[in-house]
From Swiss-Prot:
The keyword Transmembrane does not apply. It comes from the Eukaryota. GO terms for molecular function: mRNA binding; structural constituent of ribosome. It comes from Schistosoma japonicum. Residues 110-123 have a biased composition (Basic and acidic residues). Keywords: Ribonucleoprotein, Ribosomal protein. Gene3D superfamilies: 6.10.250.1270, Ribosomal protein L24e. Residues 110-156 are annotated as: Disordered. GO terms for cellular component: cytosolic large ribosomal subunit. Belongs to the eukaryotic ribosomal protein eL24 family. This is Large ribosomal subunit protein eL24. InterPro entries: L24e/L24_sf, Ribosomal_eL24, Ribosomal_eL24-rel_N, Ribosomal_eL24_CS. The gene is RPL24. The keyword Membrane does not apply. GO terms for biological process: cytoplasmic translation.
Length: 156
């Protein structure tokens, strides 16, 4: 993807945007929008128009941001302990052999599965206890209701 640069403002012009103007003498200009094209025809100096790239370069706008960005990118790494674990403990875990780590993981998984089985057994026991005292529910006697007497008279 070829990017053009606006002849007046200095902004990038992406394909499908902007306007190319070729003068009679063969010199070509590329403008990002009508505003920059009009300013060019009015012979305004882009170094004096505050929104152009040339103005920003002339008055060193945005230069301090780039410097601070570069300063921030140089970071030094320091090893510290995390809450609840000292640096020595962390390093010991890190330097463990893979076999030891795998064995510990398998043991933890086994313990978790045992705990899950225990919970399921307790649930089943509770269900069995609840089912034992089942008595036949008493049926309620149906109420006999009389139909209301028909209304005499009409609607009015």
């Amino acid at each position: 993807m070829k990017l053009e640069v606006c002849s007046y403002s200095g902004f990038k012009v992406y394909p499908g945007h902007g306007k190319r103007v070729i003068r009679v003498d063969g010199r070509s200009f590329y403008f990002i929008n009508k505003k920059s094209e009009r300013s060019h025809y009015l012979k305004r100096n882009p170094r004096e128009i505050s929104w152009t790239v040339l103005y920003r370069r002339k008055y060193k706008k945005g230069m301090s941001e780039e410097q601070t960005k570069n300063e921030l990118s140089v970071l030094t790494k320091t090893a510290r302990g995390i809450a609840g674990a000292s640096l020595a403990e962390i390093m010991a875990k890190r330097n463990q052999k893979p076999e030891v780590r795998k064995a510990m993981r398998d043991q933890a998984i086994r313990a978790a599965k045992e705990k899950q089985k225990q919970k399921e057994l307790e649930k089943k026991a509770k269900k069995v206890e609840k089912k034992k005292p089942t008595l036949a529910p008493k049926q309620k006697a149906a109420k006999i209701t009389q139909k209301p007497a028909p209304r005499v008279g009409g609607k009015r």
